[in-house]
Structure formats: C-alpha cells, structure tokens
C-alpha cells in the first residue's frame, strides 16, 4: 500500500498561462512525450524544417520570425527559433514509477538542496544518457519545472521521471525497502565510489556544493563514497560529479 506521507503535494508547477519550453532538443522531446499537453507552438520556418511537421501533428502552431519568439521568453533565452506553450507534466509517484521498471540494475538519483536549475538540468541530461530510472528532489529548495530547467536538460525533462517528494529521508526509506543500496556521494566518504563493487539497484544521493548532503538525509544512506580528484581542487561542480559517478556505476 502506498504511504500517504509520500503522496505528491498539491502544488501547481506553473501559472495558469502555462510554461514556455524552448530550444530544438527540449521542443522535440516535449512533442514526443504523450504525457505533455502542449497548447501551442510558435516557431520559425527553419525550426519547423528542423523539427518536422509530422512531430508537430495537430498542435496549434504559428510561423513567425526569431524576434517574435524572443519576445515570448526571458531575455537572453537561446530558443533556436521555437517555443512551446505547455502545461506542467502530471505529478509522478516514486513507487509507482519504479514498479514499471525492471529491478536489478536500476539507478535513482536523489538531489538534496540542489536549487540551481542549470545544475539540475545538467544532471537530468546525464541521467538520460546513463539510463537512470528517476531523479528525486524535495518539493522545496529544488527547481520546479521551467523553461530554464528544460533547456539545461536538453530534452531529458521529458524523458527521465523528475519526481518531487515531501521528505527525502522518507523517500530514501522507501528506496531501501524496495532493495536499493543507498550511497551518499560526499568528499569525506569512506571509500572511492569505484571500490564499492556494488551490484543491484542503487540510489545515489548528491548534495549542494555549499552545504552538501544534510545530516538526516545522510543518515538514511547505507554508505558514503567519494570521487578521487587532485588535491589542488576542493570539489567538482555537482553536475560534473553526477556525470562521473554515473559513468563509474555503469562501467
């Protein structure tokens, strides 16, 4: 039975007008995602050629020049001539999402207090590249779905389940019950990540570059590991650390 405490909170992702997803890769992924409701597309002739009329399907669309697309978006947004006005994706439940995946070699990323959408988006992009089953965040102090997050993820926001929960510690408890070995990635971890020789399902916990993984969250991990780096550098950017760790776990 599903734990009611982990039920996704009733918190809207976006304003009533919807959010704007922009850029060729994010737009293609959104158009291909059956869970994504798209209200309209605004794009240039060149972007239409890149995306293809077939992928647009029956989505209401308008052909404009690049400046018209820019006016719909935050200043400086790199849109490559396309913007989609969308609804936020329906909320996902962690246990239900994992029930639809085959156990044995799954990886779930758990992000603790990583609030920068560029970092979170880059982590999603790596998650897609390495076949991660889900990325889990807390419903506070984590990026909500947005055009910036989608752009940084380069399409992965619409391909990797991005799940927010009320409490990360309880989510880690649930992952433990489901058979996941929970690893905190931290500079003071007990051994290099490569030395763990871990088989089976893994939940990898990443913390913010400033404060790291919170104490209570770390206490819900089975072990802590680190990525060896040159002593002249204190740490890696968290999105770079995620990519290195995922490569190591999949190697």
Give the location of each predicted region.
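N-terminal positively charged helical leader segments and presequences
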Residues: 1-99
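Structured adenosyl-cofactor binding patch, chiefly the S-adenosyl-L-methionine
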Residues: 28, 33, 128-129, 150-156, ...
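Short, ordered loop/turn segments at secondary-structure junctions
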Residues: 46-47, 66-69, 139-142, 188, ...
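Short basic, glycine-rich beta-strand/loop surfaces that mediate nucleic-acid
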Residues: 76-87, 153-157, 161-163, 199-207
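RNA substrate-binding interface of SAM-dependent RNA methyltransferases
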Residues: 101-190
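Short glycine/serine/threonine-rich phosphate/pyrophosphate-binding segments
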Residues: 118-122, 213, 238
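Active-site/ligand-binding-proximal alpha/beta "capping" segment
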Residues: 183-233, 237
């Amino acid at each position: 039975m599903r734990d009611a405490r982990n039920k996704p909170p009733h918190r809207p992702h976006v304003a009533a007008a919807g959010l704007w997803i922009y850029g060729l890769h994010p737009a293609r992924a959104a158009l291909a995602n059956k869970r994504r409701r798209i209200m309209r597309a605004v794009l240039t002739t060149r972007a239409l050629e890149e995306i293809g009329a077939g992928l647009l399907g029956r989505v209401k669309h308008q052909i404009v020049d690049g400046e018209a697309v820019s006016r719909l978006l935050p200043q400086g947004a790199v849109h490559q001539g396309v913007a989609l006005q969308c609804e936020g994706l329906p909320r996902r439940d962690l246990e239900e999402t994992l029930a639809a995946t085959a156990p044995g070699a799954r990886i779930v990323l758990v992000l603790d207090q990583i609030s920068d959408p560029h970092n979170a988006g880059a982590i999603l992009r790596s998650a897609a590249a390495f076949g991660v089953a889900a990325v889990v965040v807390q419903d506070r102090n984590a990026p909500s779905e947005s055009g910036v997050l989608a752009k940084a993820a380069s399409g992965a926001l619409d391909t990797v389940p991005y799940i927010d929960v009320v409490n990360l510690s309880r989510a880690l408890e649930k992952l433990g019950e489901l058979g996941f070995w929970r690893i905190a990635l931290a500079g003071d971890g007990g051994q290099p990540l490569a030395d763990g020789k871990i088989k089976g399902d893994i939940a990898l916990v990443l913390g913010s570059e400033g404060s790291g993984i919170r104490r209570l969250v770390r206490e819900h991990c089975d072990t802590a590991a680190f990525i060896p780096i040159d002593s002249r550098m204190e740490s890696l950017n968290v999105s770079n650390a995620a990519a290195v760790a995922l490569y190591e776990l999949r190697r």
